[in-house]
A protein has these predicted regions:
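Beta-strand-rich domains and repeat architectures in extracellular enzymes and scaffolds
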Residues: 26-67, 73-106
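Beta-rich, blade/repeat-based domains predominating
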Residues: 28-36, 57, 84-96, 133-149, ...
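Blade-loop segments of beta-propeller domains
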Residues: 74-146
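Beta-propeller domains
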Residues: 95, 190-342
């Protein structure tokens, strides 16, 4: 098939994407094209976990934890699926039908597809995709973003020099490569791109996609202590957010956001067409918003902790009403809550020390349950007694976090817990269980 036919077909597909009805998933950072919104109690958390040499089988694995308080195994690990190797497990994402989880390795660039739809409490590994480097030239698959019938993958690096210049790869839900999109290195709208990648966030109503930027394999697979002491290495972190036309998949603007902007979160309330991101190296929250002329702009609106101490903000999670934002800072182990009632002026209203190192944060759709995990990257995690590897669950009443349970992944011989995704039992199964009680 020639390029013109491919472009024509993709244009049609992305036209359908913009027109598609949307539903946000349980945890508030997922693709708007996800089905099966869990508005009530989630039953399971699946944790994509880095293998640790000498701990258990040493392999990366998908760990499943029962998180329903009415269950007899509440707060317990009820299963794990090992992939038989260690490739720096990091992030994962659902397909649009919510039946499959795609999970990637930042080191080996393999993608593992787990069936979580057939029996959510017992995931099965059904496919391994190993052709990303050969098909796209990219390595380090990070973000798995559901589109109708497709998965868009945001990558961190490339196979040529293992630096930060990279792009996006598009696959269909069956695991077949379709095409790729380079993140711009040239000038767009008067701002020069760095070509770096990280997260993906789509606003269908605005026909806009945002991508953020981190660093390449040569940095993230190196000791953090070495990286921060190497002036040359510190030059190789992203400093841009790219604005894309979703239908054409072409960049329309490049926004200057210094300090490695990581997770992107659109406000979810109807009509709230703004997004936020946190810059890891500068400890800043940035607001991305359209002006009256239709131009997108990035604005530094808040500081997280004391930037001089390099708290290293990592994951963020926006509330369903867009009025609150959780931020985890890795180095000091603090979970912060910001009031976003006025996104131009976020205010930190609460913080809690939740671990010796904390990374990912996920919340239920109703905002009443918050979960954190500890691991960032195998070469960046702390050592000795500070190398805490846990999942901690909390209740949130709008004023304070109260502990519900925790799982010690070191004690359980599982590894380093990173990304979390929620699932729930099928409604029919829940009804049968309720009648049996």
């Amino acid at each position: 098939m020639n390029n013109s036919k491919i472009s024509s077909r993709l244009g049609f597909v992305f036209g359908l994407i913009i027109a598609a009805s949307t539903a946000w998933a349980d945890e508030t950072c997922n693709s708007p094209y996800m089905s099966g919104l869990i508005k009530g109690q989630e039953d399971f958390i699946h944790v994509w976990t880095l293998g640790e040499k000498g701990l258990g089988d040493g392999s990366d694995k998908l760990v499943t934890i029962d998180v329903n308080p009415s269950s007899g195994t509440y707060g317990k690990v009820i299963g794990s699926v090992s992939v038989g190797g260690r490739g720096e497990a990091h992030h994962m994402g659902f397909t649009d039908d919510r039946k499959y989880l795609w999970a990637g390795g930042l080191d080996d660039s393999k993608i593992y597809v787990f069936d979580v739809g057939s029996s959510p409490g017992k995931p099965k590994l059904v496919r391994t995709i190993a052709d990303l480097p050969a098909k796209s030239g990219f390595v380090g698959p990070h973000t798995f973003y559901a589109l109708p019938g497709r998965v868009l993958i945001g990558n961190l690096s490339n196979g040529a020099d293992k630096g930060g210049v990279t792009g996006l790869a598009l696959y269909n839900n069956k695991g077949a490569f379709i095409t790729k999109y380079d993140i711009p290195t040239g000038t767009v709208g008067g701002v020069k791109g760095d070509g770096y990648g990280y997260d993906i966030a789509v606003n269908p109503s605005k026909n806009v996609m945002l991508t953020s930027s981190f660093t390449g394999w040569t940095n993230y697979m190196r000791s953090l202590n070495e990286v921060v002491k190497d002036p040359e290495a510190m030059k190789h972190f992203g400093s841009t957010v790219v604005v894309w036309d979703l239908k054409s998949m072409k960049p329309t603007q490049i926004l200057s956001v210094p300090g490695a902007p990581l997770e992107m979160r659109w406000a979810l309330a109807p009509g709230q067409n703004w997004a936020v991101t946190a810059a890891a190296l500068t400890s800043k929250i940035w607001l991305i918003k359209q002006d009256s002329a239709g131009t997108w702009a990035a604005k530094d609106v808040a500081t997280i902790g004391d930037p001089a101490k390099i708290p290293l903000p990592v994951d963020i999670s926006i509330t369903a009403d867009g009025k609150g934002l959780w931020v985890n800072t890795f180095m000091d182990g603090v979970t912060h809550y910001f009031d976003l009632s006025n996104p131009e002026h976020p205010r930190e209203t609460y913080q809690k020390h939740t671990g010796r190192q904390v990374n990912m944060v996920s919340q239920s759709w109703d905002g009443k349950r918050v979960y954190i995990t500890s691991s960032l990257l195998s070469k960046w995690d702390k050592s000795g007694a500070d190398n805490e590897q846990v999942l901690r669950a909390y209740r949130w009443d709008g004023h304070a976090l109260t502990s519900s349970f925790e799982v010690d992944f070191n004690k359980e011989q599982l590894g380093r817990p990173h990304h979390m995704k929620f699932t729930a039992k099928p409604a029919a199964q829940v009804a049968l269980l309720d009648r049996a009680k």
